[in-house]
Curated annotation (Swiss-Prot):
Organism: Halalkalibacterium halodurans (strain ATCC BAA-125 / DSM 18197 / FERM 7344 / JCM 9153 / C-125)
Function, in words: Succinyl-CoA synthetase functions in the citric acid cycle (TCA), coupling the hydrolysis of succinyl-CoA to the synthesis of either ATP or GTP and thus represents the only step of substrate-level phosphorylation in the TCA. The beta subunit provides nucleotide specificity of the enzyme and binds the substrate succinate, while the binding sites for coenzyme A and phosphate are found in the alpha subunit.
Alphabetically ordered keywords of this record: ATP-binding, Ligase, Magnesium, Metal-binding, Nucleotide-binding, Tricarboxylic acid cycle
Encoding gene per record: sucC
Highest rank taxon of the organism: Bacteria
GO biological process: succinyl-CoA metabolic process; tricarboxylic acid cycle
Keyword Magnesium tagged: yes
Pathway: Carbohydrate metabolism; tricarboxylic acid cycle; succinate from succinyl-CoA (ligase route): step 1/1
Keyword Transcription regulation: no
Stored SUPFAM superfamilies: Glutathione synthetase ATP-binding domain-like, Succinyl-CoA synthetase domains
PANTHER family, alphabetized: SUCCINATE--COA LIGASE [GDP-FORMING] SUBUNIT BETA, MITOCHONDRIAL, SUCCINYL-COA SYNTHETASE BETA CHAIN
Database matches in Pfam families: ATP-grasp_2, Ligase_CoA
Protein name stated in the entry: Succinate--CoA ligase [ADP-forming] subunit beta
Sample GO molecular function, one term: succinate-CoA ligase (ADP-forming) activity
Subunit structure: Heterotetramer of two alpha and two beta subunits.
Amino acid sequence: MNIHEYQGKELLRQYGVAVPNGKVAFSVDEAVEAAKELGSNVCVVKAQIHAGGRGKAGGVKVAKNLDEVRTYADEILGKTLVTHQTGPEGKEVKRLLIEEGCDIQKEYYVGLVLDRATSRVVMMASEEGGTEIEEVAEKTPEKIFKEIIDPVVGLQGFQARRLAFNINIPKELVGQAVKFMLGLYKVFVEKDCSIAEINPLVTTGDGKVMALDAKLNFDSNALYRQKAILEFRDLDEEDPKEIEASKYDLSYISLDGNIGCMVNGAGLAMATMDIIKHYNGEPANFLDVGGGATAEKVTEAFKIILSDESVKGIFVNIFGGIMKCDVIAEGVIQATKEVGLSIPLVVRLEGTNVDLGKKKLEESGLNITAADSMADGAQKIVSLVK
């Protein structure tokens, strides 16, 4: 789950991580009032959307008086920002962060991620702040320093100090930087983050170390124990189809293709998308119905897939282990009748009760194309949607 920058900074502040003073605004008048309350000579007006690259897209403006705050707020609110992370459709700005300006001396990068290679949380830091860390990794990887964190003892002070010295934090500010990193790590662990990025971390003219931007993502599987984080959820920033899918414990991610996929198991779902691509098709979604799908779940899955107008055909690829193929067949039949399916449907079943499942599909009298294998199914659906 993603949250907005201002929410991330609010959370960081609770853990003693230094951030600039700021206020959220949902209207132009609120933005001006927020700037008045901050009382800063310079304010930054920042669009709040779940995507990076806002500055380049015109979503971050520096205002030197209240008139400029009003002008920029009016300009940004309601605007659709298109960045490298939003896709061509962009995201509409519905809220702003009005933040006090600061005298930036130097920009750095600090981030925490899960490293699959070591199965550990890793803190990364670089003195190349303010730019995409992926770009730094590609062009100058020697400028990125890492500390692998032992989960038993957590991030240690000496590790934070080593990072601070490696990225050339001024010696007199190393203590602040260490406190910052330790606080950030505490947030990451205690709040079940999957990513915590501060880009840029800055040193200021008045001798402070603070987060100028904050990106915190959270493990959705841990939200049951993170009620406070769940309250930060902004449904306006999420795909309506993904929201609907979550109500039925379906894992759904929208893609750009025209072949709807309904599969059980994340691995099989990814393999299904791969094989569709292999046969020159384009998947319209990732949809994992899970191991305990019912006829109701399958019906809802069909409805969600069909709510995407770009879908021209559906490929159902099920391996019945925990889930029985006859139950899936019943769900497919029920869903096909209920939604009045008018586009091609290819079904591949394998596993528990597969013969019974295939028999039910054959006897349904519906226009369902059976597939003998995953490759056969992919070829059939690709040819049917052309």
